[in-house]
A protein has these predicted regions:
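Short helix-initiation/N-cap motifs at beta->coil->alpha
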Residues: 65-73, 91, 156-157, 231-245
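Hinge/lid segment of periplasmic solute-binding proteins
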Residues: 90-140, 150-162, 185-186, 213
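Short, solvent-exposed loop/beta-turn-alpha elements that line the ligand-binding surface or hinge
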Residues: 107-115, 165, 193-216, 263-265
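Extracytoplasmic/periplasmic solute-binding protein
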Residues: 130-134, 139, 159-206, 248
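Short helices/loops that flank or line small-molecule/ion binding pockets
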Residues: 71-82, 99, 147, 163-167, ...
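Extracytoplasmic/periplasmic substrate-binding proteins
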Residues: 219-266
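Conserved N-terminal structural module of periplasmic/extracytoplasmic solute-binding proteins
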Residues: 2, 12-13, 25-95, 109-112, ...
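Glycine-centered hinge/linker elements that transmit conformational signals in sensory
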Residues: 161-162, 203-233
Length: 266
């Protein structure tokens, strides 16, 4: 089984989107727009856009980044309060939409054609669009050039590389094995899937975690652990610390990891 370290393996992504609050539409305050976004998700950039919008339209824009935004939004929106617009990852959309907290959006085809189709799939609920995609975050293989000048092209190369690095007191790869967000790309790389996606929707009766592809990917991961090339107890903090200290040559992480990587100066 040749599992490449390219885009197919690390296709799992989190899609951030702009959602319009349905309760807010019911009690719009003329001349004012309140937007919520997480503090680490382009807050400063959005604030600048808000200033320009305010200057162009005369509508006051307030950008806020409350703690635990994703938990506070349904609480306040359920009572008709909260922001007019919220930016968050698409994994929360279904629950919000099911509770009637989001307004349907109707971008024309010309606008939709500007973005990849899968981004619209991520913000569709019961056949209706409930948000605008604004960004996609994906996992990637991050490597230390001092330890691995040329990263492996297939997963099958990792055991040999790990043995070579172990002789130098290092290891080849560490990443979070406690959350399926990080392990799923490997499981899905050879055709594994959670629910079958057809005709624009998921079939919850067609579960693919027991498929041949899923078994192949998981078996490969288990073999890496059995052969001591990886440790089953590795979590996010352990993997991050090992990579940033130069103890392991490679890790699998997202763009949010780069701040600490840069600080480590490896």
């Amino acid at each position: 089984m040749k599992i490449k370290t390219g885009a197919r393996v690390f296709a799992l992504s989190a899609l951030a989107a702009m959602m319009i609050s349905a309760p807010a539409l019911a009690k719009i305050e003329e001349g004012k727009l309140v937007i919520w976004i997480n503090g680490d998700k382009g807050y400063n950039g959005l604030a600048e856009v808000g200033k320009k919008f305010e200057k162009d339209t005369g509508i006051k824009v307030t950008i806020e980044h409350p703690d635990k935004l994703e938990e506070k939004f349904p609480q306040v929106a359920a009572t008709g309060d909260g922001p007019d617009i919220i930016f968050w990852a698409h994994d929360r959309f279904g629950g919000y939409a099911q509770s009637g907290l989001l307004a349907e959006v109707t971008p024309d085809k010309a606008f939709q054609d500007k973005l990849f189709p899968f981004t619209w799939d991520a913000v569709r609920y019961n056949g209706k669009l409930i948000a605008y995609p604004v960004a996609v975050e994906a996992l990637s293989l991050i490597y230390n050039k001092d330890l691995v000048p040329n990263p492996p092209k297939t997963w099958e190369e990792i055991p040999k590389l790990d043995k070579e690095l172990k002789a130098k007191g290092k290891s080849a790869l560490m990443f979070n094995l406690q959350e399926p967000y990080f392990t799923w790309p490997l499981i899905a790389a050879d055709g594994g899937y959670a629910f079958k996606f057809e005709n624009g929707k998921y079939d919850v009766k067609d579960v693919g975690v027991d498929s041949a592809g899923a078994k192949a990917g998981l078996t490969f991961l288990v073999d890496l652990i059995k052969n001591k090339h990886m440790n089953a107890d590795t979590d996010y903090s352990i993997a991050e610390a090992a990579f940033n200290k130069g103890e392991t040559a490679m890790t699998i992480n997202g763009p949010w990891a780069w701040t600490n990587i840069d600080k480590s100066k490896i």
